[in-house]
Amino acid sequence: MQEQYRPEEIESKVQLHWDEKRTFEVTEDESKEKYYCLSMLPYPSGRLHMGHVRNYTIGDVVARYQRMLGKNVLQPIGWDAFGLPAEGAAVKNNTAPAPWTYDNIAYMKNQLKTLGFGYDWSREIATCTPEYYRWEQKFFTELYKKGLVYKKTSAVNWCPNDQTVLANEQVIDGCCWRCDTKVERKEIPQWFIKITAYADELLRDLDKLDHWPDTVKTMQRNWIGRSEGVEITFDVKGYDNTLTVYTTRPDTFMGATYLAVAAGHPLAQKAAANNAELAAFIDECRNTKVAEAEMATMEKKGVDTGYKAIHPLTGEEIPVWAANFVLMEYGTGAVMAVPGHDQRDYEFASKYGLTIKPVILAADGSEPDLSEQALTEKGVLFNSGEFDGLAFEAAFNAIADKLAEKGVGERKVNYRLRDWGVSRQRYWGAPIPMVTLEDGTVLPTPEDQLPVILPEDVVMDGITSPIKADPEWAKTTVNGMPALRETDTFDTFMESSWYYARYTCPQYQEGMLDSKAANYWLPVDIYIGGIEHAIMHLLYFRFFHKLMRDAGMVTSDEPAKQLLCQGMVLADAFYYVGENGERNWVSPVDAIVERDEKGRIVKAKDAAGHELVYTGMSKMSKSKNNGIDPQVMVERYGADTVRLFMMFASPADMTLEWQESGVEGANRFIKRVWKLVYEHTAKGSVAALNVDALSEDQKALRRDVHKTIAKVTDDIGRRQTFNTAIAAIMELMNKLAKAPQEGEQDRALLQEALQAVVRMLNPFTPHVCFTLWQELGGEGDIDNAPWPVADEQAMVENTTLVVVQVNGKVRGKITVAVDATEEQVRERAGQEHLVAKYLDGVTVRKVIYVPGKLLNLVVG
């Protein structure tokens, strides 16, 4: 064994061994308990960032630990390879998206191997290959035949710069999340999957997810948004159709003073023909912000359509307004407004001088004061005719029944969740497998024509999708009839909704999944990724699993038992102000800093002498130029050091502050372990440990070893507090480094302790542990070694701490044998000088003894 720790030599050698031995390749084995550990697959952007490294290190630690418990562990990896960034890069680099993507995959794969992640590379998938997306296309055609897929014209968020549709969540401050261009509203035909058909089950089954974070479950509950209410129909004077609204507060119905419709509603469109102000307003609404957060804060605007609706219970005429806060695609595109008891309706009514009618009493039974805001709390009705005096539930039922009796109302369960629009007007995605015949008939692509292959040898102009620009690509025949292919591609969330299942059988050619393999491995035991995916990917992931279950491919109801959302990685951020007032962000690597006595940054400059503004720690990002390249850190310190720091610096679900001083500390610790093993093994062979021959000090040290094993096992396995597990190992190492190594049993005990330490550290620092295990004479590769088991007998304390009181006041603490008698404890207490001075010259009148815990001497 060499004296110096040289990670660059060790790590490449160990990684080559894993590759040659195919150490982490697994197959189904009914004789072993399975464990499926999965980190969210990366987008091949070109280089790994520290967020990736944290995610995959957590996964690898869990997988290696479970493997050491003797389980059959699957830990696969792949590439979420379709998506818009590839198109931008292709235009910029004058290439096609495919070669750019495949080059990135090759580079990032090498980075993952350099970090020592124990993946089963035989299962690697790239979602942009026809071998993968052919099954997704086939499944889509089957969903279409089941009636779960449909096409309709829909108002969408349209980014004129990227020429694509954006989901509501991708609209930030009215602008595109990628390029910051102002988003427009546009009507285009789109394909949808009926996720709403599964809304109830998606909501209900959240209760089965005991090991998912409550925050994620709450976000999904709110996103699905189940509500119980009443759908009410209004007649409209001079308009051929009725208006239908949905309300969860029918108790306030007698206070409805106007209706509001979306700018795109047929009633508004008809009224605009003779109303220039309304026509201009409708035009303005085409660019309205549509993300819910934006709609909540934007200025509420509207125009009177001139139409009057008839209140079904009072017969009163109430105005119908077109308003920018009503959207056609939400509900019926019309809402009932009760300004006395809804703040949004109140603000709108106040602005335009509309009637505000209170119908709910304040909590103290008085009429509400509506001079400044609406009363939104539930309460007792007044001003409501026959319903006066009813509280919320009774009023809800009475008014719902009355409306039903008159044929103008119906109880209904509604959801905020909308069907999943899967069409994207981009090139680099899986083609949607649908065709249109010359007579307009729409059909799924026949199975013998699947996959519909995306041509990869294309020229990108940055404006039009190559498959839209090439009329020949769209031409095909179906059943001998000419047809045109769909030129939209799938939303990339389609690929990431089922990849976890394909990992169980990536080479299977008979269908989307080999049910036998899928049902052996699924559900995933732990899924690791960022909380930013809570309501998009993680909802579609659950939805797709249920679709595959109903297609007979899997038997479980949910795709993953546990979800672990890792925290973000933060780093220092610095900038200087340029000549034109712009901020120029400087990498923390290039910042020369001065710190105060507490280590806080007080001054900073860069190599060019610019005075830098320090903005504190923020998420590593390209925009702030504060990302730290993992490659540089691995080359400087080794992969094991980077991994250890990542797991030690913070609890896995909390933010991690990148500090190079912490990385240096992790490196020093590994060197200390190396040094102790080197010194120990240099002394030659070790005798067998004889537990019965150990001295009290040796027993105490062995007790510490086994208590550490118990704690680390609990911290990694049950609590998943990886940082405290590492802290416990570090604490034990301090004791081992100070322990005597002269006697035969000293060395035998150290041998047992070091073999335990190396195995406990193995999930975190696998390269150095692989090497040290061999040096310590461990049997076989450490990758196949069992996790150390705490010896219950060794952990039994043979002494205990007894608190000594005199007249009820604590005067000292004494260590006694566990089996000491009361007499022995009293004698030992009398020898303790802190206690003895209170007993001098007094008589002990009474003794209260709680064995092994407390001795109270009552004196007088």
Curated annotation (Swiss-Prot):
- Tell me a Gene Ontology molecular-function term this record carries: leucine-tRNA ligase activity
- The regions listed as transmembrane in this protein's record are none
**EC supergroup of this enzyme:** ligase
The Enzyme Commission number assigned here is 6.1.1.4
- Tell me which PROSITE patterns the record gives: AA_TRNA_LIGASE_I (PS00178)
Q: Where is this motif: 'KMSKS' region?
A: 619-623
GO CC, alphabetical: cytosol
Motif 'HIGH' region: chain residues: 42-52
Family as reported in the entry's similarity comment: Belongs to the class-I aminoacyl-tRNA synthetase family.
Q: What is this protein called?
A: Leucine--tRNA ligase
Give the originating organism.
Salmonella paratyphi B (strain ATCC BAA-1250 / SPB7)
The organism's taxonomy opens as: Bacteria, Pseudomonadati, Pseudomonadota, Gammaproteobacteria, Enterobacterales
Encoding gene (name):
leuS
